[in-house]
């Protein structure tokens, strides 16, 4: 029952205003479909008839229109994928007393009941062939439910309760049509809630990602979108590489003959390249490894054994005396020699100014076991630093032990000067740059020497050493031009301007003379043999024997060329002429190389080295044996007899000694 004071409906027991929806659902679950046109028409006719009977005035039209509006405002049933079902709309009998009532409230109540009865829910049944009616939003717009009253025709109450179109759509979308009218208070609360500004939803865990995707998509579609940097172009495949094929079971069995041949050829090429690389590596190393292994294997013998039991003790003593002579004559600088010899002229009214004695800085390329340490200790000008370099590690260890023995006083033979400071390093002096040695860097080395260097460096630059010595070693550098130039670059880089380069090596003039003599004798023998056999026909298959080897020597030394040297003895090109040298108790068939002297001297000019001295060993003895310093030194070293003055060497040792010569270059 509708209560005007509360503007709401109240239910009572037995009241027919109870919802017809519940009664239809409980009493008649299965209904027969009735078209909506008939339903609206029937309800419209009954309502119009009742209104005409009770109110023949125009106000009756308002009630009928309200009923039609309420029926149209009901939402359409949603469609599904199942076939449309048949539903029946059943009207409950209308109470005549309610229609004849003159009270407007009862009239309104009766109209509301009729509208509720007409909007009974339609239940789905299977097997229906009639389509379910759908509401057309274009033809029937959604409108709020308004119950007509007698005063609506003047526009007083209906206008006040009517909602805005936006509110009507929002209200119908938010909740379904109620079974009964909503109270005014509830409608006001719903209106305020809808008009209230909706708060921002709290961000979720994926809000930032979704926002970035949305913004990035919008930016890409915009006109000002700027693309990222382009990726680098893909690398083109190697022409030799074939596209990778898929691996399938049994694919190897389907390999063709062409693929097998290609694989075999590639394998052979790889093996050939490995062999060539190994050969190049061995050739680049040359005889350095062989020489190092040989000198590492030579046992260390004492001084007493060399003087008493050695078979070549005379040759050993003579070689040491020649090296001492070279050190005594050319290790001091010009100022020291002028002061020592008294050849420098001073002012008449003044004496010799007191000058602090300058000490030498010496680097020895191929120091060996340190056999020359005592010779440098007896040098006329004292030595401040001695640096010994040698590729044989064992020899470096033995040289360091010998130096430590000299420092401790063992083997002191009345030396005049205090022992100098010495440093020993294992280093290939001819195949590598000496600038990598720490002590050489500290003293100083010039990397700009030689061809291609700066003019200012060659004029004013230079290293920090006074003397560079190389005793019986430079013939290992003539394996190739690169090694020879590297050796001279190390020498010139270490020397300061005015420095001396001392050394001894095999005499190429002796080698050339020997080769020419041997070739001449061989030609004479061949001519004699050809003359003797000219009358006799050679037997079938007989070949004249000619090994082509050139060698000479005696019981204590031997020189052998593995290949035929030039007949005239002139070695062209000047590098790579290898021979094997044997020396009793010293050298066991070690490969060495010819040092063509004129080619070597021309090469030194490229490194600002000027030749000052060069003599064979026997000529040095002839010129220096009567020197007041070197003559007595030869007697003390056992080279000459103290009584007779005879050279204490055999003829074989003299022949072996004649194979070498000494030299000295100045750095200009």
Swiss-Prot record:
mRNA cap 0 methyltransferase domain residues: 310-668
Enzymatic reactions: a 5'-end (5'-triphosphoguanosine)-ribonucleoside in mRNA + S-adenosyl-L-methionine = a 5'-end (N(7)-methyl 5'-triphosphoguanosine)-ribonucleoside in mRNA + S-adenosyl-L-homocysteine
Basic and acidic residues: compositionally biased ranges: 1-19, 133-142, 257-279
Enzyme Commission designation: 2.1.1.56
GO cellular component, one term: nucleus
Pfam families attached to this UniProt entry: mRNA_G-N7_MeTrfase
Binding positions (S-adenosyl-L-methionine): 323, 366, 390, 428, 471-473, 476
Comp. bias regions, Polar residues: 44-65, 100-129, 148-157
Annotated site (mRNA cap binding): 369, 375, 402, 475, 592, 660
Top-level taxon of the source organism: Eukaryota
Subcellular location: Nucleus
Binding site for mRNA: 319-320
Keyword entries, A-Z: Methyltransferase, mRNA capping, mRNA processing, Nucleus, RNA-binding, S-adenosyl-L-methionine, Transferase
Compositional bias per record (Low complexity), positions renumbered to this chain: 73-88
Region (Disordered): 1-281, 524-547
Feature: compositional bias, Acidic residues: 537-547
Gene Ontology BP term (one): 7-methylguanosine mRNA capping
Transmembrane region(s): none
GO molecular-function terms, A-Z: mRNA 5'-cap (guanine-N7-)-methyltransferase activity; RNA binding
Entry function: Responsible for methylating the 5'-cap structure of mRNAs.
Family: Belongs to the class I-like SAM-binding methyltransferase superfamily. mRNA cap 0 methyltransferase family.
Name of the molecule in the record: mRNA cap guanine-N(7) methyltransferase
Organism, as annotated: Aspergillus fumigatus (strain ATCC MYA-4609 / CBS 101355 / FGSC A1100 / Af293)
Taxonomic classification: Eukaryota, Fungi, Dikarya, Ascomycota, Pezizomycotina
